[in-house]
């Protein structure tokens, strides 16, 4: 999962800055989609509150999801206008509207990530030792790796370090 920007970023940023962020997100999606068609067989999913995004970005994201829906490779999730609190509020609204009984199973079925396994490892770049509202429900048993490296400088070698660290962890899932 790549966190393109948060709901808080959406509320706090100036219009011109948001346009730049949207443009960068579109370029990244176009690049990933083009590379994917050639060799990776990735499946794309988008999480977040899409309703507030520009129409062309919404269309691009929906098209990318639709065209890769049957791919069998790794699932790549783009968190666009995503915030953990926002997701939890949207889940509660769906639950109330559905009338289904409140249960962990029904709650999880309403999450943006329904049908996708919870993350095993979350890597936080930029020297911040917090999740900033990233997947509060899904991250309960995730291992957290924090690095001072900024996202633009996060290299394949940095990823290898994080994965090597993860492999040393004895996971107990609350036991």
Regions found by a protein language model. Give the residues of each.
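Flexible, compositionally biased loop and terminal segments
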Residues: 1-175
